[in-house]
A protein has these predicted regions:
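Conserved C-lobe activation region of Hanks-type protein kinase-like domains
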Residues: 138-198
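Catalytic-loop of the protein kinase fold
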Residues: 76-94
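The N-lobe alphaC helix and its flanking beta3-alphaC-beta4 segment of protein kinase-like domains
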Residues: 1-19
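Extended, low-complexity, intrinsically disordered C-terminal regulatory tails
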Residues: 234-355
Length: 355
């Protein structure tokens, strides 16, 4: 029996319980409806972008990009790809978490790793597009199976969109959807990273080139991508203080209790300073509590729950059963042929484009 998109999302949310992802309150059925209740969050990045005259500053774009990379790295670590990365599917938190970016909408997500065969899903071509054409990768638009690289390419296009206000392949007047997708794909393929990032910091061109050149099963270097965005902040004498373009005042963060570092040795200590510190040290501290983590750049905080009482629904699904059912979540849209494609088959062949 095929899952509904909402059931797929509920299944994945029950498996992804981490910072920057909405908490699922309950999932169930009520008469003719599937119902998913999750915590109330703030506005989407698309709505904030539109209300900010369709432009974000370099600082805001980089701060958002770093958090996007944090979120997608965690999702990928759980063997899941999102497949519909776009500004509408990122939202800010509320209250004391208003500076935190959340990622939403896992209805099109799937596993890229076969639990049965203990290997990466195989490469397949001739597939229809899953996701949103404007932000989809060149490979996804070309009918190729998606993997981690495609989520990252979509993030790259979002960053350019925020800085430029539009993308070169927007506004094509083609009524037929298939023809429009082909034209968008052609336009993307013919727009080099240099042309796409003309007039923008060189780090962005490097980022676009990197994600476009990743191999199908290659493990992305998320730290390297975060470092590129952090370097832009440093070169512009600013820092990740979570003061975004739409803020009227600086977020109310207890700076005395905030420290974050990452594997490339950059630390923000709450005093508007970027410091070079021990590259092996990586932790988050909020309200005196340290949170060990491999990498990243976000600040941990207690989640805000807007729903105090969760309504009861007929045939509501148990979270535990959803978590068990996650093991049966599909890994490929077509039948899996069992061919082994290991995560380690590819070396980091894209490193030669680094500057």
């Amino acid at each position: 029996m095929q899952r509904s998109l909402l059931e797929t999302e509920a299944c994945i949310l029950s498996h992804l319980k981490a910072f920057g992802l909405p908490e699922m309150k309950t999932f169930g059925y009520n008469q003719d409806y599937n119902i998913l209740v999750m915590e109330l969050l703030g506005p989407s990045l698309e709505s904030l972008f539109q209300s900010n005259n369709k432009h974000f500053s370099l600082k805001t774009t980089c701060m958002l990009g770093i958090q996007m990379l944090d979120r997608i790295e965690y999702i990928h670590s759980r063997k899941i790809i999102h497949r519909d990365i776009k500004p509408d599917n990122f939202t800010m938190g509320r209250g004391e978490n208003s500076h935190i970016l959340y990622i939403l909408d896992f209805g099109l997500s799937k596993k890229y790793w076969s639990s049965t065969h203990k290997c990466h899903i195989p490469f397949i071509s001739g597939k229809r597009l899953t996701g949103t054409a404007r932000y989809a990768s060149i490979n996804a638009l070309s009918g190729k199976e998606q993997s981690r690289r495609d989520d990252l390419e979509s993030i790259a296009y979002i960053l350019i969109y925020f800085l430029r206000g539009n993308l070169p392949w927007q506004g094509l007047k083609i009524n037929n959807k298939d023809d429009r997708y082909k034209k968008i794909c052609e336009k993307k393929r013919n727009t080099s990273s240099k042309k796409l990032c003309e007039g923008l910091p060189s780090e962005l061109e490097t980022l676009v080139s990197y994600v476009r050149n990743l191999e199908f099963t290659e493990v992305p270097d998320y730290d390297y991508l975060r470092e590129l965005l952090s370097n832009i902040l440093i070169k512009n004498n600013t820092c990740m203080d979570f003061f975004f373009d739409w803020n009227k005042e600086k977020p109310n963060i207890d700076e005395d209790n905030i420290i974050f570092t990452n594997d490339y040795g950059i630390e923000y200590n709450g005093k508007n300073e970027w410091l070079n510190r021990n590259k092996d040290m990586c932790f988050r501290k909020v309200n005196g509590i340290s949170h060990n983590q491999k990498s990243g750049s976000s600040i941990y905080s207690k989640p805000v729950f807007a729903i105090n009482q969760v309504p009861s629904f007929k045939n509501s699904k148990n979270i535990t059963s959803l978590n068990i059912n996650f093991q049966h979540l599909k890994t490929a849209d077509n039948s899996y042929n069992g061919s082994r494609v290991n995560d380690t088959n590819y070396t980091s062949s894209t490193k030669n484009i680094r500057k």
